[in-house]
Each structure stands twice: as C-alpha cells, then as structure tokens.
C-alpha cells in the first residue's frame, strides 16, 4: 500500500496556476516497458485499480508510475479548480519527467480519456 512519504513531488504550471503533483514511481527490470497509470474522476493512486496495476507491474518486472491529479489524493490544489486540460497537463508532465522507458499508458474512466488526449 502507498505511504505518503513514498510520494515524490513535481510542480506543474507557473504562477498562480502552479500546483504540486504527487507521484509514485517504481523502477522495473531493464528492457521491459513500463506502465503509466491514470486514475478516473475523483479517484487517486491509492485506489484498488491503481494498486492492482502496481502489483501486476511488480510481478512482471515493469516500471510503474502513477500520480494524483491536482485536488486528488496527496496532490495539492482544490478539486474545484480542476479541468480535463489541467489534469492532462499534469499527466504529460509526469510522463515526461518520470517515464524513461517505452511506456504503456493505462487509464480508467476519465484517465482513459486523458490517455487518448
């Protein structure tokens, strides 16, 4: 299970639009593709689906990266300020900062929509 002290932080946006995004990253075996998990609306990276994806990644030697969108879980910001555009910007920033290997993007519900954007 996820612990708050395990989460890394990344700042996305500038000025008043800046927000701190919580990220969990677990490295995998060299040569294996990784997984980026994108949660659904009002879900976070500690949810059942996110934990199952992380467990699958561990047992198959894959890296796994997951985040809490702003206003969700361990990330900063108010939920009411969230938009699909902001949450997409956060997902892209996390992908660019953390996903070093070829990566499969997996999303649930709203996270699936964001994965397609």
Question: At which residue positions do the language-model features occur?
Answer:
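The serine-hydrolase catalytic nucleophile loop
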Residues: 41-54
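Short, hydrophobic alpha-helix immediately C-terminal to the catalytic nucleophile
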Residues: 92, 116-117
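N-terminal cap/lid segment of alpha/beta-hydrolase-fold proteins
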Residues: 2-30
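Short beta-strand element of the alpha/beta-hydrolase
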Residues: 32-40
